[in-house]
Every structure is written in structure tokens, then in C-alpha cells.
């Protein structure tokens, strides 16, 4: 049994049993992977994968247990490397983060700047995606940390730590009627709304607030990016609902932000990492 064989069966599962995609991601050949899997199955005396002709179609019952153990072994191997790096050069290495646009654009820049000043020999790598995508990256150990408000709780193998609470603001053009009256859910629901796609930046709590009052918001446009939302508010498509931290009066001229924290429950941004991961000192 070879470590490489364990990596192959683990990666095949991450690529939905697609051997070609697995080979491409590992910069190796499809026949080479198939041969190593057959050798491992022959050594173990069982099939890890069920097949239809040459295609892998499912994981066998025993294969599921084997792959779970393989994932732990691969994680332990990575931890061994981290321990060695920490012992030889504790301030040198790499750090990979997966997060959403809102966090990358509005929250992390000052944090990243301070980190890079404190650890100039650590290279940083940032991946952006949906909350589900970045949670999967952390669960699969493809990044060190995932930072998001949604989806992390769906993965049992992730440790989650709350980082900060935030709420929302209503974004309107200068002179909008909502600026002249108390802000209510009824008033917001009466307007065309531009906001986040479901599953992004606390959108689920937004929908729950309206549903709790028996209201159906008139959402006319959705996006994953607060900058895009503000652009379409400027175009007159509707009023925007975004994270308050994504509004900057100096940069967002021509727009006004109305605090809506009394209407919606706080959202909590969390940092998640794979359970059992050895964390470097930095």
C-alpha cells in the first residue's frame, strides 16, 4: 500500500468519480491512476469502487470506510509536514484562505495588510467563491481556512469559530422617499429590491425576517457582489439591501445608507478549518 494510492482514491471521490478530471488535477495520466487503484484493490482483496465497464459509478460499502481512513491519513501526513516546517522555520510558509467577495473586498484588506507586515516570509493565497464552494474547499483541505457567514455549518468535519457580527443597510439614491420616513419591513417590501443571491451574505436571514411578518419582498435583481448591487441601485433598478460594512460614504457618492439593524437579526461571520488540522503559529 502506497501513500500515492490513498491520495488517488481520495481525489477521485473529490472529483465525483471522474478519473480523467482527477488525473488532470494531479498532473498525471488516467491509465496510471486506474492501474494504481487496481493494484490497491488487489492488495486489499476487495473493490473500493463499483464499476460499469471502465467507468466508476459508485463507492462500495467497504470503500467508503477505506476512503474515510485515507482522508485522515493524508491529513496526518500534511500535519507532519507542518510540524517539521514549524520546527525549522516558524515564520516562513504559506497560508490559503477561501472567502466571499464581501469579506475579501471590505473586511480582510486591513487584516491581510497587518498579517503581511508581521509575517513577510509567509505567502498568502486567496480563493473567492460561494459560501458552499469555499466550505467544500476547507472540508477537502484544499485551503487552510474558509471565512463566510453561510454554509460552514453544513460540514460536520469543520471547526467553526465566530469572528464578528454584522447587520444590513438599505441603499437608496439621494432624494429617495425612504429617507423621509421611519424604515419598516412593509416600506421595504413595497419597493423593488436589489440584493444578494440566496445563500450569500446572510440572505437567508433576510428572507426569514420578511416571512415572519407575512411579507413577500419584491426582489427584482440579485447578485453575489455588493459593488454590483450598488451599481444597479444607481441605475434606478431598485433599492439595495447589503451588509452595512460594504457601504463607504466616501466611495459611494450619490447613494445613501439607511441603517436596518432594527429590522433584521445579526448575522455572524465565522472562520472554519478542517477538524484535526495542525495550525501553524502564524
Where are the model-predicted features located?
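Short helix-boundary/capping micro-motifs
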Residues: 12-29
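Secondary-structure junction motif
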Residues: 178, 192-213, 279-282
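Hydrophobic hinge/microswitch elements
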Residues: 130-143, 149, 201-258
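A late-sequence structural motif
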Residues: 107, 256-282
Amino acid at each position: 500500500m502506497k501513500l500515492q494510492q490513498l491520495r488517488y482514491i481520495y481525489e477521485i471521490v473529490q472529483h465525483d468519480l471522474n478519473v480523467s478530471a482527477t488525473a488532470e488535477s494531479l498532473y498525471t495520466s488516467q491509465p496510471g491512476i486506474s492501474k494504481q487503484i487496481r493494484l490497491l484493490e488487489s492488495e486489499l482483496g476487495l473493490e473500493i469502487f463499483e464499476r460499469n465497464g471502465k467507468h466508476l459509478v459508485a463507492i462500495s460499502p467497504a470503500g467508503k470506510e477505506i476512503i474515510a481512513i485515507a482522508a485522515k491519513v493524508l491529513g496526518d501526513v500534511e500535519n507532519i509536514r507542518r510540524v517539521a516546517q514549524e520546527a525549522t522555520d516558524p515564520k516562513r510558509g504559506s497560508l490559503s484562505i477561501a472567502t466571499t467577495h464581501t469579506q475579501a473586498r471590505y473586511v480582510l484588506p486591513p487584516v491581510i495588510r497587518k498579517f503581511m507586515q508581521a509575517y513577510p516570509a509567509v505567502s498568502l493565497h486567496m480563493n473567492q467563491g460561494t459560501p458552499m464552494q469555499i466550505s467544500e474547499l476547507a472540508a477537502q483541505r484544499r485551503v487552510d481556512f474558509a471565512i463566510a457567514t453561510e454554509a460552514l455549518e453544513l460540514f460536520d468535519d469543520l471547526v467553526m469559530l465566530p469572528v464578528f457580527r454584522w447587520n444590513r443597510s438599505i441603499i437608496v439614491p439621494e432624494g429617495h422617499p425612504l429617507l423621509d420616513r421611519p424604515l419598516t419591513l412593509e416600506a421595504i417590501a413595497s419597493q423593488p429590491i436589489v440584493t444578494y443571491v440566496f445563500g450569500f451574505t446572510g440572505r437567508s436571514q433576510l428572507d426569514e425576517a420578511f416571512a415572519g411578518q407575512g411579507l413577500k419582498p419584491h426582489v427584482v435583481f440579485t447578485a453575489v457582489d455588493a459593488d454590483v448591487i450598488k451599481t444597479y441601485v444607481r441605475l434606478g433598478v431598485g433599492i439595495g439591501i447589503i451588509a452595512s460594512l460594504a457601504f463607504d460614504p466616501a466611495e459611494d457618492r450619490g447613494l445613501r445608507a439607511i441603517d436596518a439593524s432594527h429590522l433584521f437579526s445579526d448575522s455572524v461571520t465565522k472562520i472554519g478549518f478542517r477538524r484535526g488540522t495542525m495550525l501553524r503559529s502564524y
